[in-house]
Amino acid sequence: MAAAAAAVAGAGRGGGGGGGGGGAADPGQERSRARSWVGAERSEGRRMEPNEELEEEDSPGGREDGFTAEHLAAEAMAADMDPWLVFDARTTPATELDAWLAKYPPSQVTRYGDPGSPNSEPVGWIAAYGQGYTPNSGDVQGLQAAWEALQTSGRPITPGTLRQLAITHHVLSGKWLIHLSPGFKLDHAWAGIARAVVEGRLQVAKVSPRAKEGGRQVICVYTDDFTDRLGVLEADSAIRAAGIKCLLTYKPDVYTYLGIYRANRWHLCPTLYESRFQLGGNTRGSRVLDRANNVELT
């Protein structure tokens, strides 16, 4: 749980430190603070990687070129640096969760604040931390340095290469991604995920606020170790048990930290798995596909 919790706050800003167990990156020396509206207190908050989410969204006009990727990364960096709405189960009674969810539904919390929305100031992300949230970091700086060296070495860049880099530098966390349009379904899905986090069935999660230009919002649900297939599948099952029926995709954080997006020059697929809801015939509630090998896992 520690690694996933750190990833939620994770770095991507070039932060990181020495080895350490688990697979999460450190948030760049805690350069910013996450605002918790629970109890009207500002709490020290760890960040998620700035590139991780917006690059997963459909790009404007269907574009997926370098300019678009850089623009999305910049937008995500800005979101990472702004205050967050955080429900921290380590310091806040679980009995307060329903009121918090009702006060800050993600379809109504706006990215830059609005007099008619629950927030008058900018909000970067909305997050739920489980009781087991324990910051832990991998060596993101070492990972990025090794990546730069690899690119200039002339050696092949393959999924196996990136997997080994992640293992070597203890950057093993990853996340299931859930994309939904603003509205009741999004709010209902986030409420189910947040409850699962607070009750200990999931570890830690975040959701993006509503953008000014509209478009889908995204929920990220973290796991400690993308190489632990059983753990990844267990998280998928918990997400389905929380009532989520839409398509899920799973992305290791190593791709995020190294800035590898869709339509990249190495022709790498940054998402390892996809999960589709299945009604009946499967007690898990979903069918999970290994995208790289085109093999069904469940």
UniProtKB/Swiss-Prot annotation:
InterPro entries: Bles03, TIF_eIF4e-like. Residues 11-25 have a biased composition (Gly residues). Residues 41-50 have a biased composition (Basic and acidic residues). Residues 1-10 have a biased composition (Low complexity). Residues 1-66 are annotated as: Disordered. Pfam families: Bles03. Belongs to the UPF0696 family. This is UPF0696 protein C11orf68 homolog. It comes from Mus musculus.
